[in-house]
Amino acid sequence: MATTNSRAATRTTTGELRPPLPPYDRDGAARKVRLAEDVWNSRDPAKVATGYTLDSVWRNRAEFLSGRDAIVQFLTRKWTRELEYRLIKELWAFHENRIAVRFAYEWRDDSGQWFRSYGNENWEFDASGLMRWRIASINDLPIREADRRYRWPLGRRPDDHPGLSDLGL
């Protein structure tokens, strides 16, 4: 089994902290997940990238990338294609500096076809709370517009909106 120090030291900007910091307890891990959901729902690639180490390594589906610049480029492409993106994340498990989440997001393409994308992510954080490793597996399901479950205005999910488990997803 890999230890929490399974990767080499990561490069971060001096003094750059992203609380809550590891090691995570249930409350800290749940806060970290909601903060990640909120920033991804901003659909601002540069803002999202600040939560990752300078040399963060990602696997997103079958695409591999490394570093904040690559993250910004990837997210710019993603949100050019995935329109009206709305995301909900849910804590699945945590241990020390690692968090596992499940998520679902809804979006439409430029032809008007709606999708719900389901996935799981494994995250590993450095001591400053920046994510240094992200592994995401995602599947897209075409849905009818009438089957959408996420109808809040674009941006942060309202606090009173149901989560994944509450929605039966």
Locate the predicted segments by residue.
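A beta-strand edge to alpha-helix "cap/lid" segment located at domain peripheries
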Residues: 2-24, 73-169
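A solvent-exposed, acidic/Ser-Thr-rich amphipathic alpha-helical stretch
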Residues: 27-31, 45-99
